[in-house]
From Swiss-Prot:
Keywords: Cell wall, Secreted. GO terms for cellular component: extracellular region. It comes from the Eukaryota. It is found in: Secreted, Cell wall. The keyword Secreted applies. The keyword Secreted applies. This is 10 kDa cell wall protein.
């Protein structure tokens, strides 16, 4: 859950 990612 980070900006531009699915983590």
């Amino acid at each position: 859950v980070t900006v531009g990612h699915v983590f």
